[in-house]
C-alpha cells in the first residue's frame, strides 16, 4: 500500500540519471577595455570576437526555448548592462539605427528589419547586443582608458548577480543561472580584490557557477582561478601562451562553455587550473610563508607597511603595536643547577 | 505535461526513414525544433560538433561523461542514432552533414532561407491585434472541445475537424452523430498544449493517407512554432501542401486568415507556443501587470488555476466557462452553481463513473493539480494527500481481481512430467501460474497449442524409448 | 495424458477469494478449480457475473454519505 501514499516523501533518486530540463539564464560579462583588445589585435579582432560571442548567445538560446541571456560590458570607467536594454531604449535605438546606418566601426552591415532569415528570438538579441557593445566601445575615451588601470570586474559581477537575483529568486521562475566572464588580461590591471571576492562568495552561496574565459597574454589572475574553483565553474586560458589560439574562440565557447548547470554534475568539466592556493602578500605580490596579518581585515603582508596603514582596510596601527612586533623573543636566563 | 508531447513527436520522428529525415533537416527551423526536443546531453554534444570540421572520436565522448552517468550517455547515443543525426563508425562519430549545415545556418543566420516564415511587406488594410487573435483562437478551440463534450454551443466544427476527430479515435460515429470515446475523455483532461499536439500528430498520420508530403507538413508545423505573435506572414513562402494545410489549421484556431483567399495569415498564441513550455510562464511581476491591465482571457493560457479542493473532498471551482464545468462534471458530483463558481463533492460514485469511462486516477489528479488555485499551489502539498490517496484507492478497488484467459493443465502422472512441461512453458514465456505442490499450471490461450504438441511429442518419445 | 481445461485465471487477495467461494456455494457453476490462497480458475462466461456480484457485495459495506442524506430527506 505504500505505492499509493500521496504524502510527498522527497526520496532523492540515488542514481539521478534523469536530467531536469530547467531553462537557464546566462550572464555574459564582456571585457570592453579597448587597449587590452588592441594588444591582441593580431590574434583576434574585436569584430571576430563579437561575432563568436553572438553565435554563442544564439547557441545558448537554442538549447531551450525558455533560456534567457543577460549581457554586461565593463571597462575602466565602469560596467553597464547591454542586454536586456531598458524598455524604451530599444525602440529609440532601432529608429536611430535605421536613420544613420553607418554608426558602427569596422564596416559592419547595419542589420535590416526586412531580413527575417534568422529566428526572430536570435535576431532581436543579436541586434541589441551588437549595437550596445559598439556604442560602449566607441564612446570610451581612449586616452583616459590607458591611464586608468582599474577594471570594473567587481561592478560587472555585482550587476550580474543583481540581475540574476531579481529574475530567478524574486520572480520565482524555475531557472538556473550561471555567469561567464570573458576577459582580456591587461598586464597592469588592478582589481579591487575584496569587492570581487565578495561577489564570488555570493555566487557560491547562490550556487551560480562562474566560468572564466581568458583571451589575453597577461599572467593568470589567481583570484579568477580561485573564483572558478570555489563556484565549480570552468576556467580556460585561450592564449598563445598555452599553445591555443583565440581565433578559434567560437569553438572553445561552444564546446567548453556551453554546458548547462543542470548537466554539469554528469560531465567532466574542461577546466584547466592548478589553483595556487598559497597566500600572497598584498604589498609585494610575492608568495609568503610567514608574515604579518592585519587584525581587522585579515590581509597578509610580508613586511610592515611604511605608512603604518593597512593597504586594504586602511586602519592605522599604533606605534606601540608595531614596535612590539620588531622585538626578538626573550631569552630566559637558565638557573645554574648546583650539583650536590 | 510537455514531456508527453515530446515523447510522441519523438516516436513519430524516430519512425521515419533516413531519407525522409534528411529531407526534413534541410529546413533550419525544423533542425532547431528537433534540436530542442533532444535530451540535454545530446544538445551539448551537438553544439560542440557544429563548428568542428572533423568527426569526433568515440573515446573523447566517453571521456567527457562521468563514469557514474554512463547510462545517460548510452540513452543519448541511441536516440541520436535513431534520428539519424549521428552515424557511428568504429572509432568516430560523424554528424549528419545536412543537419549540421542547417543548424549552423539557424545559429549564424544571414543565409537567405524562408523556413522561419516570410513576413508581409505590405500593410494589411484589415490589421488585427493580439487581443483579437487570442479571442479568435479561444473561440475556435473551445468550439471543438464543447462539441466533444456535448454541450450545445450553437456552432459545430467544420467537416475537416469532424473527420479528424473520427480518425483519431477521440470520437466515434453513433446513430447519426458522434459520441466521445474513452480516449476522448482522456484528451479533455490534458492541457491545451498537449491537446494541440495530439491533434497535430493525428493530422500527420492522416496526411499520409491524403498523399500529403509529411516533410512539408512537419516543416510547416515547426515553422509555426517559431513565428512571432501579432505579425502577419505571407503565403508566398508556402508550398501547395502547406497552403492546403492552412485551411485545416484555420479551423483549429491555430492561424487566422480573414478569408480563404487572403494572401496573408496571422499565427495565434496556440501556434507560437507550440514548441515552448506550457503557455505563458508568468512571473510574479507579470501577473501583477496583467491583473491591473485586465488583459487576455485565462482559458487559453491555462496558467491561472481556479479549483480549490478541501480535505473533506469538497470542491469549489471559480469558473463560468461551460467547458470547464463540463469537464469537472466527468469526475465530480457537482451540486450547486453560482454566478461565478460551481461547488461539488468528489465521492466514490463520481470517481467510479470516471474510471469506468476510461479516465485514470493519475489524469484526474494531474488535472486537479494543474488547475489548482494559486493559493493551493503555495502550500506544501498542492492537493490534500487524503484526497489524492483516496482517489488512487478507489481506482485500485475497481480492479481487485485480475482475470486472464488461459488453459489449466492438471493431472500429471508424475513430478518429472510436470516439471518438463512446465519448464517448457516457462521458456516459451506463456506460463501464467504454476503450483508444483498440486502439479498444476496455467498457460495463456495462445501458448496452449504448443504445449499440447510438446506433450504429445514427449509421450511418443517415452513410448518409443520404453519399447 | 494430462488434462487441459479452458478457463479464466483469477488473481486476487485471500479476502476476495473467500467472497468468490461464498458466491459459488449458492451458485455451483462458477469455480472450476481452487489453485491456492490467491488464485482461482473460473468458468470463462462467469467472469462478468462474478465482477458484478463482487461490486455489489463491496458496495454494501462502504459508507455512502449521499445515501444517508437521501434517506434523511426522503423520510
From Swiss-Prot, chain A:
PANTHER family for this protein: GENERAL TRANSCRIPTION FACTOR IIH SUBUNIT 3, TRANSCRIPTION INITIATION FACTOR IIH TFIIH , POLYPEPTIDE 3-RELATED
Family as reported in the entry's similarity comment: Belongs to the TFB4 family.
ZnF segments: C4-type: 294-313
Gene3D superfamilies, A to Z: von Willebrand factor, type A domain (3.40.50.410)
Subunit structure: Component of the 7-subunit TFIIH core complex composed of XPB/SSL2, XPD/RAD3, SSL1, TFB1, TFB2, TFB4 and TFB5, which is active in NER. The core complex associates with the 3-subunit CTD-kinase module TFIIK composed of CCL1, KIN28 and TFB3 to form the 10-subunit holoenzyme (holo-TFIIH) active in transcription.
Region called Disordered, residue ranges: 85-117
Compartments (UniProt record): Nucleus
Role of this protein: Component of the general transcription and DNA repair factor IIH (TFIIH) core complex, which is involved in general and transcription-coupled nucleotide excision repair (NER) of damaged DNA and, when complexed to TFIIK, in RNA transcription by RNA polymerase II. In NER, TFIIH acts by opening DNA around the lesion to allow the excision of the damaged oligonucleotide and its replacement by a new DNA fragment. In transcription, TFIIH has an essential role in transcription initiation.
Chief location of this protein within or outside the cell: nucleus
Protein name: General transcription and DNA repair factor IIH subunit TFB4
Curated annotation (Swiss-Prot), chain B:
Subcellular localization(s) per the UniProt record: Nucleus
The keyword Nucleus is annotated on this UniProt entry: yes
One Gene Ontology molecular-function label: ATPase activator activity
Alphabetically ordered keywords of this record: DNA damage, DNA repair, Nucleus, Transcription, Transcription regulation
GO cellular component, one term: transcription factor TFIIH holo complex
Main localization (coarse): nucleus
A single BP term in Gene Ontology: transcription initiation at RNA polymerase II promoter
Highest taxon, organism lineage: Eukaryota
Subunit structure: Component of the 7-subunit TFIIH core complex composed of XPB/SSL2, XPD/RAD3, SSL1, TFB1, TFB2, TFB4 and TFB5, which is active in NER. The core complex associates with the 3-subunit CTD-kinase module TFIIK composed of CCL1, KIN28 and TFB3 to form the 10-subunit holoenzyme (holo-TFIIH) active in transcription.
PANTHER family per UniProt: GENERAL TRANSCRIPTION FACTOR IIH SUBUNIT 4, TFIIH, POLYPEPTIDE 4
Known function: Component of the general transcription and DNA repair factor IIH (TFIIH) core complex, which is involved in general and transcription-coupled nucleotide excision repair (NER) of damaged DNA and, when complexed to TFIIK, in RNA transcription by RNA polymerase II. In NER, TFIIH acts by opening DNA around the lesion to allow the excision of the damaged oligonucleotide and its replacement by a new DNA fragment. In transcription, TFIIH has an essential role in transcription initiation.
Family to which the UniProt record says this protein belongs: Belongs to the TFB2 family.
Protein name: General transcription and DNA repair factor IIH subunit TFB2
Source species taxonomy: Eukaryota, Fungi, Dikarya, Ascomycota, Saccharomycotina
UniProtKB/Swiss-Prot annotation, chain C:
Main location: nucleus
Gene Ontology biological process: nucleotide-excision repair, preincision complex assembly; transcription by RNA polymerase II; transcription initiation at RNA polymerase II promoter
Protein origin, superkingdom: Eukaryota
Compartments where found: Nucleus
Protein name: General transcription and DNA repair factor IIH subunit TFB5
Stored Pfam families: Tfb5
GO annotations of cellular component type: cytosol; transcription factor TFIIH core complex; transcription factor TFIIH holo complex
Key word Transcription regulation present: yes
Subunit structure: Component of the 7-subunit TFIIH core complex composed of XPB/SSL2, XPD/RAD3, SSL1, TFB1, TFB2, TFB4 and TFB5, which is active in NER. The core complex associates with the 3-subunit CTD-kinase module TFIIK composed of CCL1, KIN28 and TFB3 to form the 10-subunit holoenzyme (holo-TFIIH) active in transcription.
Protein's job: Component of the general transcription and DNA repair factor IIH (TFIIH) core complex, which is involved in general and transcription-coupled nucleotide excision repair (NER) of damaged DNA and, when complexed to TFIIK, in RNA transcription by RNA polymerase II. In NER, TFIIH acts by opening DNA around the lesion to allow the excision of the damaged oligonucleotide and its replacement by a new DNA fragment. In transcription, TFIIH has an essential role in transcription initiation.
Keywords: DNA damage, DNA repair, Nucleus, Transcription, Transcription regulation
